[in-house]
Each structure stands twice: as C-alpha cells, then as structure tokens.
UniProtKB/Swiss-Prot annotation:
EC number(s) on file: 7.1.1.-
Oligomeric form and interacting partners: NDH-1 is composed of 13 different subunits. Subunits NuoA, H, J, K, L, M, N constitute the membrane sector of the complex.
Native source organism of the sequence: Pseudomonas aeruginosa (strain ATCC 15692 / DSM 22644 / CIP 104116 / JCM 14847 / LMG 12228 / 1C / PRS 101 / PAO1)
Name of the protein in its database record: NADH-quinone oxidoreductase subunit I
Keywords, in A-Z order: 4Fe-4S, Cell inner membrane, Cell membrane, Iron, Iron-sulfur, Membrane, Metal-binding, NAD, Quinone, Repeat, Translocase, Ubiquinone
Residue intervals of the 4Fe-4S ferredoxin-type domain: 52-82, 92-121
Pfam family, one: Fer4_7
Cofactor: [4Fe-4S] cluster
Cofactor note: Binds 2 [4Fe-4S] clusters per subunit.
Length: 182
C-alpha cells in the first residue's frame, strides 16, 4: 500500500514537473524567426555579399593586382588586368562565383586598395547556379564603402596627371641624389 502511494506521488510530481517545464518554454524567447516578416539579427562583423567600391573621385578602386584571386581558398575570383592611357590599372573583367564562395573574407584582407568589401547582404538565392556568377557591373557600387576618404593612387605615389611628382598625399618631394655627393 505504501508503495502504491509512493508511485501515485511520484507520478503526480512527474506530471507537475512536465507542466512547469512546458509553461517555462512557452514564455521564453523563441529561437525560430518568421524570416521574411521579421528581420534577422546580424552581428556587426557579419560577412556577406562581396562588392567592389569606388574611390572618392568616382573611379574604380580595383587595380587588378590579382591578390584577391590568389588569397581565395576556393578559387572563385577571376579577373584580367588592363591599363588606361595614363598608366592606371583596372580590371577588364572581374568575376566572382558565389556558388563556390565561402565568405571567408580573405579577399578583403588581401586587397591593398580596399576595393573588395563584404557587406551584410545575404539574400542572394537564385534558381539557376549560373545566376550566382556575378560580373564587374553586378559587383560595383556607386559609393566608396567603408573607407570613404582613402584613395590608393594618391597614397601609393603614382604620378597623377597634371601634378608633379611629390605632390600626392603622403609623398615626399623627389631627392636629388647627385647633390648629396661631395
């Protein structure tokens, strides 16, 4: 008889514990979001879609140095270098295959001109895999991105048309080495 009472008390306690657990989970913050209706929280350093930025003058920042393609562990970046009349390099074509990209950010770190930047955009779903291959015109944005005042050619020391050598930002005047001789 005592064993039956213990079984009834144990069964009742188990049922009450289950009810408390259910009510506790009912009022807890939900893990599942109704995605299109509710915006998804993204951390501040989230790495999403890759874009190509422009310098403050409105020109392409990319100098087609090919460092991003070399740094990419899956080889999803391909580009071809071309040169303007004034000696400035630019990519003739720039292609990223987002179906292979793992969004690691190594291309952004390797870029010396900060032309490649990763944005928090993640909605890139397509029905055909070929639509995930983005060309240069798909990747170029109109603004400078994260570094609005940085201009690679002014810092790098390349001669700017109409300006003498040494007139660029962070560039020293040319030194006459013959005047240093005794």
């Amino acid at each position: 008889m005592i064993k039956e009472i213990i079984n009834v008390v144990h069964g009742t306690f188990t049922q009450l514990r289950s009810l408390v657990m259910i009510f506790g989970h009912a009022f807890r913050k939900r893990d599942t979001l109704q995605y299109p209706e509710e915006p998804v929280y993204l951390p501040p350093r989230y790495r999403g879609r890759i874009v190509l930025t422009r310098d403050p003058d409105g020109e392409e920042r990319c100098v087609a140095c090919n460092l991003c393609a070399v740094a990419c562990p899956v080889g999803c970046i391909s580009l071809q270098k071309a040169e303007t009349e004034d000696g400035r390099w630019y990519p003739e074509f720039f292609r990223i295959n987002f179906s292979r990209c793992i969004f690691c950010g190594l291309c952004e770190e390797a870029c010396p001109t900060t032309a490649i930047q990763l944005t928090p955009d993640f909605e890139m779903g397509e029905f055909k895999r070929q639509d995930l291959v983005y060309e240069k015109h798909d990747l170029l944005i109109s603004g400078p991105g994260k570094n609005p005042d940085y201009n690679y050619y002014r810092v790098a020391g390349m001669a700017i048309a109409g300006k003498p050598k040494g007139a660029a930002q962070n560039e020293a005047e040319p030194i006459n080495v013959k005047s240093l001789l005794p």
